[in-house]
């Protein structure tokens, strides 16, 4: 059983990302043709040489409304469902469509699933948003050493209106336990959204803040935007002193840095 996401307003005709891994047909090795890309190598692909194509989806997410975080789930032979998703990005659509499809395969009624999704008591997770007066504070997981996850998290900023302050704690927060020396993944990650003039300040925390700062500068982010803090305590104090009172503060954190991100929030 397969599921998919139809073309959205954010889909592109060519790969818009630095990393686009799956370009060859898994059957014959010739180049794939994409009807559209969602991000990186995720989209609707087919092979003009041997006829390979993605299988027909039993469940398809369509009519994605990013502004209101809703989409329509179409199931072969069944009534359509209007469903919400979290996070404001396509990850939320894929995750919700997969979960609902699984529930349908287990025999749950579509109406019951939709009602349960509309009324959950959500636990803290990879995306949270809350208001403090005129200021919106967003925390979002950006998986360490995963350029696709990191690119999609950073791209969220492109669709956030108004002035933005960004906090990056996406490199090794626990070097002594889960340490590594590989920073090549930073160069497969797209940081284009940070170049926008609406992003006023970028705080970078952690022992690898200088590596990340160099990557941002090489990608065209203005150096004067950057504030570097190898020590997370100093980063927290700087945020307390300089935090804006309106707009958006977006805190991106790697897998092991969630306690740090929650403290900064």
Label every model-predicted segment.
Residues 8, 64, 76-78, 88, ...:
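Generic structural motif
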Residues 19-22, 29-32, 39-54, 101-110, ...:
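ATP-dependent carboxylate-amine ligase
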Residues 82-90, 137-139:
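A short glycine/serine-rich beta->alpha loop
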Residues 1-84:
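Extended acidic/charged loop-beta regions that coordinate divalent cations
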Residues 20, 87-98, 124-125:
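Short glycine/threonine-rich catalytic loop with a Thr-x-Gly-x-Asp
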